[in-house]
Amino acid sequence: MADPWQECMDYAVTLARQAGEVVCEAIKNEMNVMLKSSPVDLVTATDQKVEKMLISSIKEKYPSHSFIGEESVAAGEKSILTDNPTWIIDPIDGTTNFVHRFPFVAVSIGFAVNKKIEFGVVYSCVEGKMYTARKGKGAFCNGQKLQVSQQEDITKSLLVTELGSSRTPETVRMVLSNMEKLFCIPVHGIRSVGTAAVNMCLVATGGADAYYEMGIHCWDVAGAGIIVTEAGGVLMDVTGGPFDLMSRRVIAANNRILAERIAKEIQVIPLQRDDED
């Protein structure tokens, strides 16, 4: 039986590459930077241009499909995940990196049916790395199969996380406290690349052993989550329970041993869900 969603995935790869070309051209030029929820929550005309390009192209080919896009939500649309085939799009994951020309910027596309992710595409466009995964068929970077690391000892692990966009003193204290707890276990190190999607792809490659973050959105992780699991890794809620795409929090690790240890150490930061008003 033919894969009903393979054509959609092939189209997503084509669109991600086209979007990446737009991003890589724009990063060379002066930018009009705007603010969203705070002085550090940035958006550019390129974010909006790329999302509009992606959604309009997909709508033309698949008019019955649904969409959740970062900039559409910022403009007032709802993040509602239904059973309908849904494209979950982050046109530029790592906008702050993009603004500063820090070279980790990704176009991220996740595709869900019946609320389950069927495939993910993450194009780290400055690096020229195309990460892809189809449910049940493995994860790849530029055609090379990915495999998570085999590390089970957290004291020998390399973690990735982000400080996030909140500058509320209480939240910042909790973020730094969580990092301190993990750092002092001790772990080999903690890194921050500046994009959730690339952080998760680094776990999929085996370059990092685990990633955790609270404050992300569904479009940050929809594409990369399946890349982690298809590379042999796990997704988990920061409480140690099942991962929930709309919860705004995730642990992505090479195995349950590291994921559960991270969940045990960190304090949960209260957040409004993506699907709540």
From Swiss-Prot:
- Per the record, what are the reactions this protein catalyses? a myo-inositol phosphate + H2O = myo-inositol + phosphate; 1D-myo-inositol 1-phosphate + H2O = myo-inositol + phosphate; 1D-myo-inositol 2-phosphate + H2O = myo-inositol + phosphate; 1D-myo-inositol 3-phosphate + H2O = myo-inositol + phosphate
The residues that hold Mg(2+) 2 are D90, D93, D220
> Which positions in this protein are listed as binding substrate?
E70, I92, D93, G94, T95, G194, T195, A196, E213, D220
Q: What is the effect of changing E213Q?
A: Strongly reduced affinity for myo-inositol 1-phosphate and strongly reduced enzyme activity with myo-inositol 1-phosphate
Name the cofactor(s) required for activity, per the record.
Answer: Mg(2+)
Give one GO molecular function term: glucose-6-phosphatase activity
Q: Name one GO biological process term.
A: phosphatidylinositol biosynthetic process
Assembly behavior = Homodimer.
Protein name as annotated: Inositol monophosphatase 1
Source organism of the structure: Homo sapiens
